[in-house]
Amino acid sequence: EVDPNGLRVWGENGRLHIQTPVMDTACIVTFEGRLYRNLSLPVGETITSIPQGSYIIYVGNQSYKIRF
């Protein structure tokens, strides 16, 4: 998914990709509401491995649903 501000979040081959134009923080939460991980995001693209499942990724005031 792409946000008008240049933020992009997507999943591919068991990896979560987050591309952001500014430093930010991402919060990865399972659909059951459990916190999986917090990530500090530098400017540019961040890639992290993530187990199969469904997640809600919060970055800034946006949320994205990702399924692996």
PLM regions: where:
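C-terminal outer-membrane/trafficking sorting elements
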Residues: 1-68
